Curated annotation (Swiss-Prot):
SMART domains to which the protein is assigned, alphabetical: CSP, RNB
A GO term from the CC aspect: cytosol
Gene: rnb
Localization of this protein: Cytoplasm
Its EC number(s): 3.1.13.1
GO BP field: mRNA catabolic process
Protein name: Exoribonuclease 2
NCBIfam families listed in its UniProt record: 3_prime_RNase, PRK05054.1, RNase_B
Protein family (similarity comment): Belongs to the RNR ribonuclease family. RNase II subfamily.
Keywords: Cytoplasm, Exonuclease, Hydrolase, Nuclease, RNA-binding
Single GO molecular function: exoribonuclease II activity
Domain S1 motif, chain residue ranges per copy: 564-646
Annotated source species: Buchnera aphidicola subsp. Baizongia pistaciae (strain Bp)
Amino acid sequence: MLRNHPLLSKLKRKLNSNIPRVEGIVKSTEKGFGFLEIDSKTSYFIPFKNMKKVMHGDRITALLKIDNSREIAEPEKLIEPFLTRFIGTIQVNKSIISIIPDHPFFKEKIVCSVSCILPKCVKTGDWAVAVLMQHKLIQGHYKFLAKLVKYIIKKDDVLVPWLVTLSRYQLESDCFKLNSSSIIFDNSLKREDLTHLDFITIDNSSTKDIDDALYVEKQSLGAFNLIVAISDPTSYIPFGSSLDNFALKRSFTNYLPGFTIPMLPSELSENKCSLKVNKSRPVIACKIRIDSDGCILHNYSYFFLAWIKSKATLVYECVSDWLEHKGKWVPECSNIANQLFMLNSIYNIRRNWRKNYAVLFKEHPEYNFKLSSNFQVLNVFMEMRRTAHKIVEEAMIAANICAAKVLSEKLGFGIYNVHIGFDASNSENVVRLLSKYGFNFCKDEIRTLKGFCKLRRILNKHSYKYLDNRIKKYQSFGELQFFPGPHFALGLDAYATWTSPIRKYSDMVNHRLLKSIITHTHVIKPSCDILLKINDRRKRLKMAERDLEDWLYSKFFSSIEYTKNSFNAEIIDVFRSGIRVRSLKNGANIFIPSSFLHNIRNELLCHQDQGIVYINDKKMYSVSDIIQVKLINIRTQTRNLIGKPV
């Protein structure tokens, strides 16, 4: 009788408006209940029945109510759903198709409509992409609904980790096919003929997209002329063409374990633009004068267009063995041997120059997966960069320094790799930390390139692994930008890469700018949109690489008796919930829950900001410590490795 009475409705609205409301993010638990996390210190309990209305990660507003003398959050309004586009496994029940999202906190099926072509033999466990169409917290909806938009792969296919990961981050999994007859070379530019010179390439034995070649001439007074020749794909790719737009979309060649997705069509990257032995190829070259102390003499260095012909395709391991007096391999002729000797000399003097006047980064091992022909992980092995790798790297760094200088002086813009060191707030934290170790710096000093280089040289000279780790936590991230700026991590005034145009679109952009300087032609200034696309792509590639490696590590350890052996691992991070370590043997990241560090919770403190674990106020573990770890569990659904100290 009073159901629709206006006074009663008004009273209900008033009472409802007086109930306190909070906004936060839903956090699920394995037991079914959850919490509404307001900030790092405040959260409210969400009972099991209320969790049925929301999903882990949803941003919502909730009413705060009292239930059995306990304050609880009752979900009221959805602000932003956690699930929008997602990956999951298909569930088939007669004619009904559902999907379970691939996430540790999602275990329930979501009924789906289908807007893509499914194979006739689709089975439960097959992988697909879906979008959330309906949410329970939106008024009028009583269930979650999704729509399948792309079928990925069968559940038992050997490529599941690769294709699922690529689909998750909306990355291509195929090579772009291009008819060779449609590739037209721009032959209008004048090029110097250097095909008679003894250019050599050094790369991995499996590399097909070879984009750099080197040649050295010795000068008087211990100086050298180094010519760095880089493949010129922009001579085949007009600016703004469909192929150019295709390259921009991909932005990078994606190197995943056992699975490479090129930026450019293979007809270009592995054939016409690859600096193959005894094949005449167009290049952009940089002639670099280096004095006996390793200093680049910019007044005698310049860029030009050329034709070259590689006289030898060499392999990193063979060259390293020969220069390190190991193995049986020898250069095929004295000219090639002489080139290697001179390149090694340049490496030594340039490295010494950068040690004294810039910054050398510390050597870190690389971990590589050994895969079988059907993509099973056979082993994970560690490799350190050897002499040949460092020779090529030093030559590329010198060439990129020259590019940054020329672009800055001639145009004032390009695509630069910039790293600003510390921002204002973090510089204060760094100064306080350094003072505890007896190093006196002021915050303004370490924010200058000179001061930052001084700090890095001190840390490189002394063995302060913990201090080094903490300071790196305060460093800013490197970024790409259009205008020149310092690269603190390299200790350089400016740095612009151009030496991998087959693999990086940003290098193609700098190629076009350098060519406009060389040929005195119209400069096409890159748009801001290009940087946004490249940075977004780089971010997704890094996340995909991390996720795939986690998946492959979990597959690798699942295939062996992982509980029998212990191994050395370095503590790389401390969280409130435990610590993360990295195996020194194979590079696997392993999480150790706090309960395995000490079983009395109120005696344990995991101090995330300090990177230290205290037990009864005594320091027991800190980042950079090497500890013995035993693997005890593999959480296959989340691809996480769980361990404990030995």
